[in-house]
Curated annotation (Swiss-Prot):
It comes from the Archaea. It comes from Methanocaldococcus jannaschii (strain ATCC 43067 / DSM 2661 / JAL-1 / JCM 10045 / NBRC 100440) (Methanococcus jannaschii). This is Uncharacterized protein MJ1281. Residues 605-621 have a biased composition (Low complexity). Residues 601-629 are annotated as: Disordered.
């Protein structure tokens, strides 16, 4: 098995995960990107089949006029994030004239009077498909789909548009283009030269310069680390497989180059490949692998081709589900192709090829939690749908769909309770009730069905995949040897499990009832030994963050085994809620459950009457009491307004001090405001578990209503607040130079504000202890764990910074017992304080959670390394002396920007070893250039921004501008890359005035006029040009918070 594992997964990981930044992309829901070597082929065939072609038609050979097209990729719009190109002739040669996939392809296009010679190539550009060839006719194409349409001329092309589906088929010269109407138009504009091509992107130019242009298949994409491309060539009896990765960061390129080179050498030694070559040019890594065609394909292509060919055929002919006859013929045709030997009593056989799956045996689970809060929750959820635990054998979550083994709930009853109308469609022998919800514009249609004793519901594509699995197709256990091995090795008798089909590891967690304990046993099979160590670290951190202590984790080569033990009572009242969440059961508790018996109805009525009487008594009590005692004036005002043509709301905090629940966020993602007013703390939610809110609708617009707020009255005036990074309470600085740790009880008393419109939840102090005598004006939660078992709170005043340090385990034990154990009265664990003094007042200080503290002062930036150090070993390891008027730091990536009064600069934080082999962190000096601009009042920087790149928001008085950070490697006179003293490639940084999305709905807002000067800026973009949204959250220099954006 291990040899097979090496050949199928290790090399795949090297070329298609390590080099392409371990990101995955799906072309269709049922096709996973390059899970084995031949998946790239099946993706390409999916693209071939995704564009049906007509029976006849004239091939119009036109000369190129507006734009010179030298490569097929020249017709792909610059906005495309995922591109798959397949050259038909080479594709047939690669798989073989008589392979199952090619025969299926011939059969399909033969139905339309075409042969493989009639199609030159196909391209998928995101969700748009382009076919170039002979005999392509848009009318017959649309007729085959059975859709009504209107005809429209667009930029020289003939378009047939179905407005119900916003779908179009267009013929332009010898191209047939179909997909989303706006996207089809964009492809036409690109061919005409009216819209930029993807080949105009610098990164794509760099990538294509590293490969020959006679590739058979090309797969190009992008993620947060850069761009990647996979290219396949036929070389006689061999196959050349090239992968090119263009990284944003040269450090990533260096690391992956060394790692992949070592792995390729191992593959060569093992005889799995014939030859290889790997090269790095600055931030670009190129790996070329030569192997025999037989080794590359093996027998996987034919086996997968049988399934993918059939599914693609079905999806092509029935994509819009309008021809019942064709559906019936498909269902009848595939009845004979179902695996008759599948054992549907085994839940594993119901799992399609998905990224995760969970299972709960309701009978066994009920015995575990009977009489506990978790059982009551399960019972109340099921009751909303007319079910009890006795009516359900088991339930499963299968990534984008859920399955419940029951004959007591029908799809029609389910949709009736939810209030959705539906249309009937047919798939794989099942009748689907297809419906849309308020989120369908973003995620697509939903479906529910009853099939072979199972109630299945979720996203339509997910439901179809589950039906395929039941029918013996698309089965995770059959297709993934590691999952099979995990299932076979884990003991039977579990009452629940969760399986993970990930790209660095496959894993499983199984729940067992063992006396007064619940034991969760896990097994992970990782890509290699190094990833196993990383997996152990991830699991260990998860356990610690959830407060678990009784666990064991062992690593043996590429395998990780885990055992977690939880008290059964604790599981029944707390941990077990996970298994009845919507992530597991899929059903949500309805506001008004219809299936409640008469006795329960009477009880509810009595309780409601009692509540009314209590409310009346409370109101009377308030009327009789002194109004000054029970009425408060809120510390903020608000109003609706329009900002830059967008719907918005403004909150004005007056002269009150405001901080944000942002200890774990960068300044670009500041969250709920905390308002400090003397001895009063007003907030809209805090980590101790209590929650209020200022209301704005994330989906449809902004609403200037505050209807619930939390008030905490302290026995002293408050100067600063920060989270305790554990969820027990807050650290609070009083005005007498004392640092407190404060734990609150859940608010049990609610009064109305002075206007009578806003509920004020009064939170009471449960425990308030003085932690240290340290006089600071600002607090920030620092390192959660510096990996030497220390937590760090950051405080500062003027030019002095204080790191208040406590042992992690001792603090968390104390905090947990103080919050949940009545009568617990042990003193706060000892703290150590280290003071730093800087030349210039401190503007801001924060941590990356573990490794270092970054300090921004008026006169420069400083790095304090704390990783794996004792408190007395914390020290300043680097400084950058410069004028700082404002700055922004992204805690997750270590990227930062700063403004010196005339220019915005970009850099990041890097690591190196000292002479004693200890790691230190420093500010990178390998970035040149910047943004010349005057009047900057605020900055934000977000890496991993929508997984597309690095984006900077720059704000001034009256404006906000959006820039996308792009890099150009610095070259010497001979064209060689230039490096700094630490061996890092030097880059010229460019601030491109645009959003990271290449889409007009977003680029439209890259520069906006606003009625304020921004200090902290958050910008969020969602969707696409058809269903997209821009959202801003801006805290201003004059103590106001603006929320504004466009509607979907």
């Amino acid at each position: 098995m291990m040899i097979l594992w090496k050949r199928q997964r290790t090399l795949l990981k090297m070329l298609l995960m390590t080099l392409i930044m371990e990101e995955t992309t799906t072309i269709k829901e049922e096709v996973f990107f390059m899970k084995k070597f031949v998946i790239i082929l099946t993706i390409s065939i999916a693209v071939l089949f995704a564009g049906c072609v007509s029976e006849e038609g004239s091939y119009e050979e036109s000369k190129i006029s507006e734009k010179s097209i030298s490569s097929p990729l020249d017709i792909v719009p610059k906005s495309s994030e995922k591109v798959v190109y397949t050259k038909t002739e080479g594709f047939v040669d690669l798989l073989g004239e008589n392979s199952e996939i090619v025969n299926a392809y011939k059969e399909l296009i033969g139905k339309y009077g075409l042969s493989v010679d009639d199609i030159e190539y196909t391209i998928q550009a995101d969700n748009t498909y382009v076919l170039k060839g002979y005999g392509l006719d848009e009318y017959k194409f649309m007729d085959e789909l059975g859709l009504d349409y209107k005809e429209e001329k667009y930029n020289g092309a003939n378009m047939l548009i179905n407005e119900n589906h916003n779908y179009a088929v267009a013929k332009y010269k010898n191209y047939l283009i179909h997909g989303n109407t706006e996207d089809v138009k964009r492809v036409i504009d690109t061919i005409k030269g009216d819209y930029p091509s993807i080949t105009e992107k610098k990164e794509i130019k760099d990538m294509l310069s590293k490969v020959d242009d006679d590739y058979v298949i090309a797969n190009i994409g992008r993620n947060y680390k850069g761009y990647y491309g996979a290219f396949i060539y036929l070389k006689g009896r061999n196959v050349e497989f090239d992968v090119v990765a263009v990284y944003n960061d040269v450090d990533d390129a260096k690391e992956q180059y060394e790692y992949v080179k070592e792995e390729l050498e191992d593959e060569l030694d093992n005889g799995n490949i014939k030859d290889y070559d790997i090269d790095r040019d600055g931030n670009i890594v190129v790996a070329k692998v030569i192997m025999s065609k037989e080794e590359f394909l093996g027998d996987y292509a034919n086996k997968l081709g049988l399934n993918f060919g059939n599914e693609i055929k079905y999806n092509t002919e029935n994509e819009y589900n309008t021809q019942t006859k064709e559906k019936s013929e498909f269902n009848h045709d595939n009845t004979n192709k179902v695996n008759k030997n599948i054992n549907l009593e085994e839940p594993y056989n119901l799992i399609p090829n998905v990224f995760w799956a969970s299972y709960v045996d309701v009978g066994k689970f009920s015995k575990v939690v009977k009489g506990k809060g978790v059982y009551d929750e399960l019972n109340s959820i099921l009751k909303c749908y007319g079910l009890s635990p006795d009516d359900v054998e088991f339930y499963m979550n299968l990534e984008t769909a859920n399955l419940i083994k029951t004959d007591k709930l029908t799809a029609k009853e389910y949709l009736k309770k939810l209030g959705y109308s539906y249309n009937e469609e047919y798939y794989g022998g099942a009748t689907l009730l297809v419906y849309t919800t308020e989120v369908s514009d973003m995620v697509g249609k939903f479906a529910a069905t009853n099939y072979k004793g199972y109630f299945i519901f979720g996203l339509k594509g997910g439901v179809e995949k589950v039906i395929d699995a039941i029918n013996g197709k698309n089965n995770l256990v059959t297709e993934d040897e590691n999952i099979r091995e995990i299932i076979n090795e884990m003991p039977k008798g579990y009452f629940a499990f969760k399986l993970y089909n990930q790209f660095d590891a496959d894993g499983g967690e199984f729940y067992y009832d063992e006396g007064d304990k619940i034991v969760i046993k896990g097994l992970w099979i990782c890509i290699d030994d190094e990833y196993a160590k990383k997996r152990k670290y991830i699991i260990e951190n998860d356990y610690e963050n959830y407060g678990y202590t009784d666990y064991n984790i062992e690593v043996d080569g590429n395998r990780v085994t885990t055992t977690l033990t939880i008290d059964k009572d604790e599981f029944g009242e707390y941990d077990g809620y996970t298994l009845v969440s919507s992530d597991w059961i899929g059903l949500k508790k309805l506001e008004n459950c219809e299936n409640v018996n008469e006795e329960e109805e009477n009880q509810i009525n009595e309780e409601q009457q009692t509540n009314v009487e209590n409310e009346q008594q409370t109101e009377q009590q308030f009327e009789n009491e002194d109004k000054e005692t029970n009425t408060y004036e809120l510390p903020l005002t608000w109003k609706e307004l329009e900002v830059a043509g967008m719907d918005g709301v403004m909150f004005d905090f007056g002269n009150k001090k405001v901080t944000f629940e942002d200890w774990k966020y960068s300044p670009c993602e500041f969250r709920n405001p905390i308002i400090i007013d003397g001895n009063k703390i007003w907030c809209f939610g805090f980590s101790g578990g209590e929650y209020g809110y200022f209301t704005y609708n994330d989906n449809m617009g902004f609403d200037a209503d505050v209807d619930d707020i939390i008030l905490i009255e302290m026995p002293y005036n408050v100067k600063a607040v920060c989270d305790d990074f554990y969820g027990a309470g807050w650290f609070i600085e009083d005005d007498n130079g004392k640092l407190h740790h404060v734990i609150f009880d859940c608010p049990k008393e609610t009064i109305m504000d002075k206007t009578g419109n806003v509920e004020i939840d009064l939170a009471k102090i449960k425990k308030d202890v003085v932690v240290a005598n340290v006089d600071v004006d600002e607090l920030m939660a620092g390192a959660e764990d510096n990996k030497n078992n220390y937590k760090i709170v950051i405080g500062w005043k003027g030019n002095k910074l204080y790191l208040i340090t406590m042992e992690k385990d001792k603090f968390e034990d104390w905090a947990y017992n103080s919050k949940y154990e009545d009568g617990f009265d042990e003193p706060f664990p000892p703290v150590q304080i280290k003071e730093f003094e800087f030349n210039g007042n401190i503007i801001d200080a924060r941590s990356d959670f573990r490794n270092y503290i970054i300090v921004a002062t008026e006169n420069g930036l400083y790095i304090i390394t704390v990783y794996k150090r004792e408190p007395d070993e914390f020290k300043i390891t680097d400084s950058l002396k410069t004028n700082i008027e404002c700055y922004a730091f992204d805690t997750g990536s270590g990227l930062l920007v700063y403004y010196d009064g005339s220019k915005v600069y970009y850099t990041d934080i890097k690591i190196k070893s000292e002479s004693d082999n200890s790691d230190i962190y420093y500010i990178a000096r390998n970035y040149e250039g910047g943004l010349n601009i005057d009047g900057v009042t605020g900055l934000s920087i977000c890496h991993n921004y929508n997984w597309l790149g690095t984006q900077v928001e720059v704000a001034g008085d009256g404006w906000i501008k959006t820039y996308n950070i792009e890099f150009e490697a610095k070259k010497d006179a001979e064209g060689n890359s230039v490096y700094d003293e630490n061996g890092n490639s030097i880059y010229i940084v460019k601030f491109e005035p645009k959003n990271v999305y290449y889409d007009e709905i977003y680029d439209k807002y890259y520069s906006i006029s606003v009625p304020f000067a921004g200090k902290y800026i958050y910008r969020g973009d969602s969707g696409d040009s058809k269903n997209g949204r821009v959202e801003f959250r801006v805290y201003t220099t004059n103590n106001k918070l603006y929320l504004f954006g466009t509607n979907w």
